[in-house]
Amino acid sequence: NRRCVEKLRKLIKKDNIKQVACEEEIQQYVDKKILIDEKDIIKYLILEILEYIFEIQGKKMEQEDIYFLINKDEDIYLENIKTLSEKFKTTNIITEELSKFQKIVENIFEEETTIYLSNNKRKSLRRAKYIVNFDYGIGEIEKYNINRTAILINIEQKVKIESMAFEGISINNVNIQIPDELIEHFGRMMEKINKNILYMSLVNQKQELARIKDRIKEDNIHILNLIGDKGIISQEEFKRIP
């Protein structure tokens, strides 16, 4: 009720609470800036998600190209691009902020790293097999001529591509396995709150990517499967992608 909501808001303000993990029906009453979202974990597991996919497909990253859709120069996004650029044959950054990202590329990437910058709606994603979509919404994505069998990993927003021509995969979330000791630690909260949210309540998201990834590894967190707009994506779906 309204009284409980006001009490919650006052408590958050009084104690200067920075992160809130709560069940879905309460989320609408909490400031999104401090609300832990079930998708938050995905930006720390991009490499692991790609490793999961490549293992199923029997492919090697160093033989493939990676594409990034990005407009915001958030540190966590740039750290991910830098990490992944070392794993793939070429790195392709698709952005509407070309001049900004030209400076970023010059500052943070080694000379031997092959980076391509583009915003060509017709050609940029025509051959893209693996796309990490940091902050593009569906309206922006639909402006591009996208490879019909592309695999998209959507970080900020859930994306459902309605085009009948698209036969690829759009990944919107990750289903994680957490160890028994953490399940015991969370107790009855596991019944009402998404486990991704509960786990991320233990993580300091202000830290750099490497430290958070170390924490996830130490906590023995593993990917069970990936989730698309129709639910769990089967391994067979990944195997059929050329």
Which ranges hold each PLM region?
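A glycine-rich, Thr/Ser-enriched phosphate-binding loop motif common to dinucleotide/cofactor-binding enzymes
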Residues: 34-52
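Adenosine-phosphate binding glycine-rich loop
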Residues: 154-242
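Rossmann-like adenosine-cofactor binding region
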Residues: 115-179
